[in-house]
């Protein structure tokens, strides 16, 4: 089971936030995450793994402040220890930066690059945020592997279409260049022929 929430910013369209039911489900989320996903977790404490799905073309720097705080509050609220504390640090990083090795426990992860891990602090619990998110909560039983494959297939098709379009433009540009070269060559030839014709005419005048 995966829990889905919707977060909105004043200046942007809605974002999807999701998290697993337990650490075993977190394994599937880690395995089948998307490049657009940002992972959140309470720093140095046990908590839920919360993911924010960015819009295509966005990166971690583009997360609206309101959406960032929604994710941070949701993580804090789903930490047995963190939910009782103030000034809780929440770490977040792109899904692609998560590192999972065979010797790690269920639900445990590391990072490929520590420099790509950011921190946001939740000073205290804000019920208004949690109540708003709770109203958007939906429980689903998704086929994460199938959804990931569908996403990847769409990306491959988009890239294929872009390559085809690029080749088409290159072909058109080459054709245009060839036509221009032929036109210049023809114009140059006509100029030479005209000069030759004029010279022939002058020679004839001299013999008359």
From Swiss-Prot:
Q: Which residues carry this modification: N6-acetyllysine?
A: 23
Q: Where is this region: Disordered?
A: 148-208
| Single Gene Ontology BP annotation | positive regulation of cell motility
Q: How does it sit in the membrane?
A: Single-pass membrane protein
Bias type Basic and acidic residues, positions: 148-184
> Where does the record place it?
Cell membrane; Endomembrane system
This molecule's function is given as:
Transmembrane receptor that senses neutrophil extracellular traps (NETs) and triggers the ILK-PARVB pathway to enhance cell motility. NETs are mainly composed of DNA fibers and are released by neutrophils to bind pathogens during inflammation. Formation of NETs is also associated with cancer metastasis, NET-DNA acting as a chemotactic factor to attract cancer cells.
Name this protein carries in UniProt: Coiled-coil domain-containing protein 25
Q: What is the lineage of its organism?
A: Eukaryota, Metazoa, Chordata, Craniata, Vertebrata
